[in-house]
Swiss-Prot record:
It comes from Francisella tularensis subsp. tularensis (strain SCHU S4 / Schu 4). This is Uridylate kinase. PANTHER family: URIDYLATE KINASE (PTHR42833), URIDYLATE KINASE PUMPKIN, CHLOROPLASTIC (PTHR42833:SF4). Pfam families: AA_kinase. Inhibited by UTP. Belongs to the UMP kinase family. NCBIfam families: pyrH_bact. Pathway: Pyrimidine metabolism; CTP biosynthesis via de novo pathway; UDP from UMP (UMPK route): step 1/1. Gene3D superfamilies: Acetylglutamate kinase-like. HAMAP family: PyrH_B. GO terms for cellular component: cytoplasm. It is an enzyme of class 2 (transferase). The keyword Translocase does not apply.
Length: 249
């Protein structure tokens, strides 16, 4: 898709309300750790474009650029539950950064967290979400589900259900779902579209199994796409050239 905003403006979004799942690493770029504001700016710009189109948008961001929680190598010195709690705090840091970057571009945004922090983070309250989204406010969900032993994919599926999302968009560095690992096999085949049943029968890798099952059970399509492509987030809503749709049977 062209970066020309005039071309974008001639198209109408296919989705009205979406849940975008971002990895923490998408904020760190090549440095691999922390937050790189300049590298994150294209994401902010695309979110602004979508809100200008009238798309209602909520985000779930991971914390892997700061700490990967249960995947961190702490040996037996730090319990898994504690490591996961540390990972939840990392998502809060990222969410606050995203909020301020959006506000700096004139985009109204608010953070809701599974665990509140007085004077800093509001506790997530599902009955508020519809009102906030209808105002055109971008919601950023932090703190995971508030429970250890689950991934931010699960947070994304849960929040997608709570807000009644038309789709869950999972931003990755791979342009969709393949029949096998494209990083290992040069003959790997990419799917433009695949059903939930086919994902199960072919044992394809889409996202955390619990999150995948929740989306299937509540009828929420999943779009897996390569965020590193030019204007990929806007394309996900307008054209869907850079990824794979997982849909109901």
């Amino acid at each position: 898709m062209s970066n020309d905003s005039s071309e974008c403006s001639q198209k109408l979004p296919k989705l009205k309300r979406i849940l975008l799942k971002l990895s923490g690493e998408s904020l760190s770029a090549d440095q691999g750790f922390g937050i790189n504001v300049e590298s994150a700016q294209p994401i902010i710009n695309q979110i602004k474009t979508l809100t200008n189109f009238g798309v209602e948008l909520a985000l779930v961001v991971g914390g892997g650029n700061i700490l990967r929680g249960g995947r961190a190598n702490f040996g037996n010195k730090i319990r898994r539950a504690t490591a996961d709690s540390m990972g939840m705090i990392a998502t809060m840091i990222n969410a606050l950064a995203l909020r301020d970057m959006l506000i700096s571009e004139g985009v109204d945004a608010e953070v809701f967290s599974a665990k509140g922090v007085d004077g800093l983070l509001k506790v997530a309250s599902a009955h508020e979400f519809n009102q906030e989204l209808a105002k055109g406010r971008v919601l950023i969900f932090a703190g995971g589900t508030g429970n250890p032993f689950v991934t931010t994919d699960t947070t994304a599926s849960l929040r997608a259900v709570e807000i009644g999302a038309d789709a869950l968009l999972k931003a990755t560095t791979v342009n969709g779902v393949y029949d096998k690992d494209p990083n290992k096999y040069s003959d790997a085949k990419r799917f433009d579209k695949v059903t939930f049943s086919e994902v199960v029968s072919k044992e394809l890798n889409v996202m955390d199994l619990g999150a995948f099952t929740q989306c299937r059970d509540f009828g929420i399509p999943i779009y897996v796409f390569d965020l590193t492509q030019p204007n990929a987030l806007v394309d996900a809503v307008l054209d869907s050239k850079y990824g794979t749709w997982v849909t109901l049977d």
